[in-house]
C-alpha cells in the first residue's frame, strides 16, 4: 500500500520528462500499484493530466505533495513485462515515458480525464466501456412439473456441455425469456463475463496433421532444441519463395502450445494478415487473437482484453502486435523480416526486431526471423554465428523456381511499341488467359498519371505544401499529393510560365485501363491504397481473386509478398527503374527483395511459373541477380558495398530530424544541435562517431513543414545513447527562439 508514487505524466517534453512524486489518499492505497493508470494534478494550475505509476514509495521532491485525483481499475494496469518494455523504449528510442505507455496500450483500453457528477472533481473516464455479456451455466435439474417445454429441454441439453453466452444460445433458438425462467427456477445461473469477439468465426477448424517435406523436417529438427530450451535463442529461417516456411511455423507453434506456452506471429502489412490468420485459425481454432491498426477501436480493445485475460494462445498482427499483453511466450516469429514496416516512423521510433529480442529474453523464447530475402544485417549476423541459420533451398512439392525474362523497354520503343506493356508481356498474358491461369502485375505507382510537366519550361507540377509532384487520379478527376492529401482540379497551363502542361507517367489506374483495352474479356483487379481503403477490402478482394473472380491482378507493393494463389503462373514487373535510383543505402536491397518476392508469387502449385521484368537498364546487376533469384550472390555484392561505404551492419545509423514551418529556423536549429553534439563528443575522443550534415531531408518539405537532418554513423550502445541524450537536454535548455521540433531515429534507413 504505497503512500507515495512516481508518475510519468502525459504531454511532458523530453527535457521535463521524469517521474513526478504524488501522495496517495488512504482510500486509494489498495488500488495503486506499479503500472496503474492515474489522473494527477500537474503544473501551477493543477490541471488534470493522465499518468502511469512507474515507482512506488517514491522519495518526496518537496515537503508538500499533491494527491492523485483518481486511479483506474486494476484491469487497466500494465503487466510487469509491459512496464519493463516502457523503460526499454524510453532508453532506446528517446521518447517520453508516456509516449512509450501509449505504444503498449491500444486506444480503447486507455482512459481520459473527465469531471465527476458533482461537476468539480476530476476523474478518469474509459475511452470505451468494457464489454460484457450474459453467460449461463447449469446448476440444477429441471423439475418434472410443470412439464418442461421443448426450448427448456434444449437449453439444458446445450448447457450440459458447459457454460454458454446469451449470443451463443440465441443462435441456437433459445430466447432470453426461456433462460430467465430457468434461472428463476434455480436450474441455471447467470453471470457477467467479458465479451469476446471472433473476427474470423467463419474459418472452419481443420486441425489436419502437419506434413513436412524432408527438407522442412530437417529445418524443424534444427530449430526444435532452441524452442524447447528455457533460455532465449534467435534463428533466421532463410527459404526460397514457395519453400513452405509457413508449414514450419505451424509445426513449431504446435510444439510451443504442447509445452503450455504461447506464440506471437508478426507480418509486415495488414494485407498479409488474412492469409496468415486463415492458416492459424484453421489449424488451431478460436484461441487466435488479431492485432493491427485496421481494426476499429472496439474490435482492438476486445482482442486486447482477450489476450490479457488469457483467452489467446496465439497472437498474429502487424508491428504493434509486439506489445500484446501475452504471457509465457515460447515463440516469436517475424515473417518477411526484411520489411521496413517493422520500424516505427513516429514516437516511439522503435524496431519491432529489437522489442521482439527483448521479449524473447524476458520469456526465454525462440525469436525466429524468416524471409526469402533476409535483410543484409540479419544474414550477416547469421553468417557470423550471432544467430542460427536454417535454410530451405527447394520449393514445396519440388516445383522449380520461375523462369524469368528481362525485357529492354528501349528496344520496345525502337520497334514501334510506345505502350508501358511490352509485346512480350502482352503475349504472355494472352497465353495465360487462354490456359485459364491467373496473372499478377506489379506497378509501384498508384494513380493514373504520375506527373504533369510543362512543355515549355519543363517544370513539374508540384504540391504547394510539399516538394513532391502531384499525381493525376482519373476516377476522381483530381491531381493529388500522396504525402499531405492536397487535391485540386487538374490544371492545363503551367503555373510557372503559362505553357501547356502534359500529363505523363503510368500508374495502377492507367494500367487497369490499358489492360481492359488489350484484354476486353479479362477480369482485372486493381490493388492499391485507393481500391483497398474500405474496411476489410484487402481480405475481400484477395478472397475474390482466390475464387477466380478475376484473371489479372495489378497493384503496388501489397501484391508482392506473402500471397499464395495456386493458379498464378505469370508475374509481370513494370516501372521498376525508379526504385533502382532511389536514395538510401538500402535501395538495392529493397529492389532485389521486391522483385524476388513478386516473382515468387508465380508457379507455386502444379504448373511452372514465368515472370517478365520490364526495364530500360537490362544490364543492371541487381536486376539480373533478382531474375536469377540468387540471394547469396546478391549478398556478397551488397555486403562489400556496405563495408566500403561504412553502412550497417558495420556501424549503426542514427538520424536526427528537425522540422518546422520556417526553413531558416529549421536550418539554424539543425546547425546548433550539430555544434552541441560536437562539443559533447569532444569530451569522449575515443567514441567512434562520424557526423554528416546537417542537410535537407530527401523530401525537403511535407505539408508546409521543412525538414533537415543530421546523419550519424556510430556504434549504437549505451555510451552513444547517453551522448545523444545529453545533447538533447542541452539543446532544450538553451530555449532557442525556434519552433523547430527534434526527433531521433536509431534504426533509420537514412531519413526521418
For the regions a language model picked out, list residue spans one by one.
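Accessory, non-ATPase domains that flank or precede helicase/AAA+ motor cores in DNA-metabolism machines
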Residues: 1-371, 383-399, 680, 718-725, ...
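A general secondary-structure signal for short beta-strands and their flanking turns/coil
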Residues: 2-4, 17, 46, 436, ...
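A short, contiguous, amphipathic alpha-helix enriched in charged residues
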Residues: 4, 32-34, 519, 665-679
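Short secondary-structure junctions
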Residues: 13, 519-522, 677-690, 734-739
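Solvent-exposed, membrane-proximal periplasmic/extracellular interface segments of envelope transport
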Residues: 60-75, 695-697, 701-713
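Inter-lobe coupling/hinge segments of SF2-like helicase ATPases
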Residues: 206-213, 217, 221, 230-667, ...
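A carboxyl-terminal module marker
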Residues: 675, 679-702, 706, 728, ...
Amino acid at each position: 500500500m504505497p503512500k507515495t508514487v512516481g508518475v510519468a505524466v502525459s504531454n511532458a517534453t523530453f527535457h521535463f520528462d521524469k517521474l513526478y512524486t504524488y501522495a496517495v489518499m488512504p482510500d486509494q492505497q489498495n488500488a495503486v500499484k506499479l503500472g496503474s493508470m492515474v489522473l494527477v494534478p500537474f503544473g501551477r494550475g493543477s490541471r488534470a493530466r493522465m499518468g502511469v505509476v512507474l515507482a512506488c514509495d517514491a522519495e518526496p521532491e518537496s515537503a508538500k505533495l499533491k494527491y492523485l485525483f483518481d486511479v483506474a481499475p486494476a484491469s487497466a494496469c500494465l503487466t510487469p513485462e509491459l512496464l519493463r518494455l516502457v523503460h526499454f523504449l524510453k532508453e532506446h528510442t528517446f521518447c517520453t515515458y508516456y509516449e512509450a505507455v501509449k505504444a503498449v496500450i491500444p486506444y480503447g483500453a486507455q482512459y481520459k480525464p473527465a469531471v465527476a457528477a458533482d461537476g468539480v472533481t476530476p476523474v478518469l473516464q474509459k475511452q470505451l466501456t468494457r464489454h460484457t455479456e450474459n453467460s449461463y451455466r447449469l446448476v440444477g435439474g429441471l423439475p418434472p412439473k410443470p412439464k418442461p417445454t421443448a426450448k427448456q429441454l434444449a437449453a439444458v441439453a446445450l448447457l450440459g456441455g458447459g457454460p454458454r453466452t446469451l449470443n451463443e444460445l440465441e443462435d441456437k433458438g433459445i430466447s432470453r425469456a426461456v433462460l430467465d425462467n430457468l434461472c428463476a427456477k434455480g436450474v441455471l445461473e447467470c453471470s457477467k463475463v467479458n465479451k469476446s469477439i471472433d473476427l474470423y468465426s467463419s474459418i472452419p477448424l481443420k486441425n489436419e496433421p502437419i506434413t513436412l517435406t524432408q527438407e522442412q523436417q530437417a529445418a524443424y529438427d534444427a530449430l526444435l532444441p532452441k524452442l524447447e530450451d528455457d533460455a532465449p535463442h534467435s534463428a533466421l529461417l532463410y527459404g526460397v519463395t514457395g519453400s513452405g516456411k509457413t508449414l514450419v511455423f505451424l509445426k513449431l507453434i504446435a510444439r510451443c502450445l504442447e509445452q503450455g506456452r504461447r506464440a506471437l506471429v508478426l507480418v509486415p502489412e495488414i494485407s498479409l494478415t488474412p492469409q496468415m490468420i486463415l492458416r492459424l485459425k484453421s489449424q488451431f481454432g478460436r484461441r487466435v487473437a488479431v492485432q493491427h491498426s485496421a481494426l476499429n477501436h472496439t474490435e482492438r480493445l476486445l482482442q486486447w482484453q482477450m489476450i490479457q485475460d488469457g483467452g489467446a494462445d496465439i497472437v498474429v498482427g502487424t508491428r504493434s502486435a509486439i506489445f500484446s499483453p501475452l504471457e509465457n511466450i515460447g515463440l516469436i516469429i517475424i515473417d518477411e523480416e526484411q520489411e521496413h514496416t517493422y520500424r516505427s516512423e513516429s514516437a516511439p521510433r522503435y524496431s519491432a526486431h529489437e522489442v521482439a529480442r527483448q521479449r524473447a529474453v524476458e520469456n526465454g523464447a525462440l525469436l525466429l526471423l524468416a524471409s526469402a530475402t533476409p535483410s543484409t544485417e540479419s544474414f550477416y549476423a547469421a553468417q557470423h554465428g550471432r544467430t542460427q541459420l536454417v535454410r530451405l533451398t527447394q520449393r514445396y512439392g519440388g516445383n522449380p523456381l520461375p523462369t524469368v525474362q528481362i525485357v529492354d523497354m528501349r528496344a520496345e520503343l525502337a520497334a514501334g511499341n510506345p505502350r508501358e506493356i511490352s509485346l512480350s508481356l502482352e503475349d504472355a498474358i494472352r497465353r495465360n488467359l487462354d490456359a485459364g491461369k491467373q496473372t499478377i502485375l506489379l506497378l509501384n505507382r498508384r494513380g493514373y498519371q504520375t506527373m504533369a510537366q510543362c512543355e515549355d519550361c519543363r517544370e513539374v507540377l508540384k504540391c504547394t505544401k510539399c516538394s513532391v509532384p502531384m499525381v493525376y487520379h482519373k476516377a476522381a478527376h483530381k491531381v493529388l499529393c500522396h504525402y499531405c492529401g492536397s487535391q485540386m482540379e487538374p490544371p492545363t497551363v503551367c503555373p510557372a510560365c503559362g505553357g501547356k502542361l502534359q500529363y505523363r507517367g503510368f500508374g495502377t489506374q492507367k494500367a487497369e485501363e490499358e489492360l481492359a483495352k488489350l484484354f476486353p474479356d479479362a477480369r482485372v483487379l486493381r490493388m492499391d491504397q485507393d481500391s483497398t481503403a474500405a474496411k476489410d477490402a484487402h481480405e475481400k478482394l484477395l478472397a475474390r481473386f482466390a475464387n477466380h473472380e478475376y484473371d489479372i491482378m495489378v497493384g503496388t507493393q501489397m501484391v508482392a509478398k506473402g500471397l499464395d494463389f495456386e493458379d498464378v503462373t505469370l508475374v509481370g514487373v513494370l516501372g521498376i527503374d525508379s526504385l533502382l535510383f532511389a536514395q538510401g543505402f538500402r535501395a538495392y536491397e529493397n529492389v532485389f527483395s521486391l522483385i524476388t518476392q513478386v516473382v515468387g508469387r508465380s508457379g507455386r502449385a502444379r504448373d511452372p511459373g514465368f515472370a517478365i521484368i520490364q526495364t530500360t537498364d537490362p544490364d543492371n546487376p541487381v536486376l539480373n541477380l533478382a531474375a536469377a533469384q540468387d540471394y547469396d550472390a546478391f549478398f556478397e555484392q551488397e555486403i562489400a558495398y556496405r563495408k566500403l561505404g561504412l553502412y550497417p551492419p558495420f556501424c549503426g545509423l542514427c538520424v536526427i530530424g528537425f522540422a518546422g514551418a520556417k526553413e531558416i529556423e529549421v536550418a539554424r536549429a539543425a546547425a546548433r544541435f550539430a555544434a552541441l553534439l560536437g562539443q559533447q563528443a569532444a569530451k569522449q575522443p575515443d567514441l567512434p562517431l562520424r557526423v554528416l550534415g546537417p542537410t535537407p531531408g530527401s523530401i525537403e518539405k511535407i505539408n508546409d513543414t521543412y525538414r533537415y537532418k543530421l546523419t550519424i554513423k556510430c556504434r549504437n550502445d549505451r555510451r552513444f545513447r547517453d551522448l545523444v541524450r545529453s545533447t538533447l537536454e542541452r539543446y532544450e535548455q538553451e530555449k532557442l527562439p525556434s519552433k523547430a521540433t527534434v526527433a531521433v531515429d536509431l534504426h533509420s534507413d537514412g531519413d526521418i
